Amino acid sequence: MTLLDLDPDQLLSTTRAVRKRLDFARPVPGPLIRDCVAMALQAPSGSNVVTMRFVVVQDAEKRRAIGEIYSEIYARYKASGSYPSRPTGDPERDRVQQRVASSADYLGAHIGEAPVLVLGCNEGSDRASALAGLGNILPAMWSFMLAARARGLGTAWTSMHRSREQEVADILGIPYDTVAQAVLTPVAYTKGTDFRPAARPDPDVVIHWDGW
């Protein structure tokens, strides 16, 4: 597999949440997902203990069932006060947020159509330890997404399915008492690979040197 010609800074700054540009019609080979997981496992983990787990969902019926749950949760989110298209009073910011909202709406309606869904999880000895160790899977999932981008795949970090985590666990046979789900992402080839850095604040706005 040929990797995209991206230097480290380009990879880090152009790995975006991809929604409307996911190619749902193109299958993603299992070995390619495995390669991304191999890279993800190089991420840091507490005490060098590998408790992160990746549930790769290729089965169409399971993807559809998870997609229905996600869509129902998203519909409630859209009706809430945290929906990203709420006016802010800043015209430029509002335009950006409208684009984000439109993109999120699309994923809310179509996530189950992605050729692959991946759930990043953490395994513990019981529910409490599984939740306490979620810090292991979070950097690993970001590494997974960087590896996917380098291979021409798109992802979108989501977690709202966790409000119905038990139902998703039941669909996939995930042992709820010992495995905590952290992240759900679609995985698909992207329509084009020309992604750009997002608008972000100047670093000096968010840096506090030697204290707050």
Predicted regions and their residues:
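Glycine-rich phosphate/pyrophosphate-binding beta-alpha loops
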Residues: 43-49
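C-terminal helix-cap and adjacent tail motif
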Residues: 2-4, 14-20, 180-212
